[in-house]
């Protein structure tokens, strides 16, 4: 689900669809986000597997490693990817960002960070970092309903509803794809 999550985050406000000449940066940022999510899911501690950790890791990877006296300085992200085996999926997902000039890579990382900025808020962090009771597979197989209640006085969090619905919908589509294009039960959104 790393690719689904990355696409949902990049598509905030239109994402790559409304990017025009900047489509490369949004597409590469989506791959970088998916790669980072995958790395944290595989190597991160259980309490580090959340969106704020993704932001922090990308921010840390923006820094340059200390150059070897004879070699050109590399970014930490390049060094990290070199440590992975060639067939590692995180390497493939980040390929567009990794196989480009250093300044372009920095722009891709900045694009990813700008999309993640929406999630840097204490209340948002509490919602996102400490698990959720929503399970797409369970939602598709058992009778269930999800009610989203938003405070009218704080409209700044409304974009989360859109993200939640997009994420759930994409996960449901992935589940349907795994089952020959069909779900066991009918799923409806109102």
Question: What positions do the PLM features span?
Answer:
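P-loop NTPase motor domains
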Residues: 1-190
């Amino acid at each position: 689900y790393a690719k689904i999550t990355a696409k949902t985050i990049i598509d905030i406000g239109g994402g790559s669809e409304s990017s025009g000449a900047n489509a490369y940066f949004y597409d590469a940022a989506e791959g970088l986000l998916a790669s980072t999510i995958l790395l944290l899911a595989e190597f991160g501690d259980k309490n580090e597997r959340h969106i704020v950790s993704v932001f922090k890791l990308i921010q840390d990877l923006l820094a340059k490693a200390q150059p070897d006296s004879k070699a050109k300085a590399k970014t930490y992200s390049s060094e990290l990817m070199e440590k992975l085996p060639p067939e590692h999926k995180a390497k493939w997902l980040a390929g567009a960002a990794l196989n480009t000039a250093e300044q372009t890579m920095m722009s891709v990382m900045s694009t990813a960070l700008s999309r993640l900025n929406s999630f840097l808020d204490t209340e948002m962090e509490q919602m996102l970092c400490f698990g959720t009771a929503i399970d797409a597979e369970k939602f598709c197989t058992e009778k269930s309903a999800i009610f989203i209640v938003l405070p009218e006085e704080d409209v700044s969090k409304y974009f989360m509803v859109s993200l939640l619905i997009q994420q759930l919908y994409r996960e449901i589509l992935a589940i349907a794809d795994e089952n020959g294009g069909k779900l066991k039960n009918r799923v409806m959104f109102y």
